[in-house]
Amino acid sequence: MKYNVAVIGYGYWGPKLSRNFSNSNNFEIKHVIDISTINLNKAKKNFPLCKISKNYKSIFNQKVDLVVISTTTISHYKICKFFLKYTNVLVEKPLCLTSKQVFELEELAKKNKKLLFVDYPFIFSGSVNYLSKIIKNNSFGKLNEIESFREQAPIRKDVNVIWDLGVHDISILNFLLGDYSNVVNIIKYKTKKLKKIDTAYINLIYKNNIKVLIKNSWISPIKIRLIKFKFENAIVYYDENDPLYKIKIYTLSKTNKSLFNIKIPEIDITEPLFRLVEYIEKSLNKKRNKIFENNFNLNITKTLEKISKW
């Protein structure tokens, strides 16, 4: 069975999502909506058979199994609410800017028996799923500390760096450690030219007293996507920028305590967005959205709200 997809927003992220859905044998891009004629022409070039429009309401009552929303964050709530009345929805992160809106959308999805997905791409990566296994299996003893560095990204006008980059860190951490975290300290910076916070240092504590430091910044000469996990018996580096060796495990040498042994495990390096597409297909088939149950979206938003209000 092929699922019909409508994509709303074909600017920066919409084409990436569209490409991954079109690469699947189980989805077909039927509609692309965007307010830009240039973007619509690009979509028509990539998907000649799709219908294009500048009005998202034009696809109401069309046979659409999944609506993909990749627009400005402030518009997510309104568009998502409109479509959850009759079909399933995938929204680019962050879902909304308030937990109240997220809760309302989650309840609407339940009421109408529709599935609501959010594009937190890294929780579908082979690297994060490998990390989940070693944490659950207690492979290297107790996990004590995590340091995450996520720097350099296109500067956004609709949200600040916490809601842009920090949402990745919080989604990964909540996926790995559970939803509860306590905000300890936040330092935020705003350059004179930018009206929004562009750099943030975030200190959190998760259950079992796991201490977390996050640095998010748009302002960086190099792109950094690095998370360090400090276990009792090892330090694990997760470098999303490394094309092949995304996970490196360092353990102290038994013969020389000033040296480390390094192990590089075999990791699935399939593009996370394609794994997201596979997950959505399975969820639609089973009519169950397992990862996003138990308030996963809501708890991420609540944490981001706490950080923003600090």
Q: What are these language model-derived features?
A:
Residues 74, 96-154:
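A contiguous active-site-proximal alpha/beta segment in oxidoreductase catalytic domains
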Residues 1-47, 62, 281:
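N-terminal Rossmann-like dinucleotide-binding module
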Residues 66-69, 207, 278-310:
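C-terminal helix-rich "cap/oligomerization" subdomain common to oxidoreductases
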Residues 167-244, 276-288:
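Contiguous beta-strand/loop segments that form the cofactor/metal-binding neighborhood of enzyme cores
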Residues 119-126, 152-183, 276, 296:
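Mid-domain beta-loop-alpha active-site segment that forms a flexible
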Residues 17, 47, 51-108:
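Beta-loop-alpha module in the N-terminal Rossmann-like domain of NAD(P)-dependent dehydrogenases
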Residues 91-92, 116-118, 238:
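Hydrophobic residues in well-ordered beta-strands that form the structural core
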Residues 121, 230-295:
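C-terminal glycine/acidic-rich active-site capping loop/insertion
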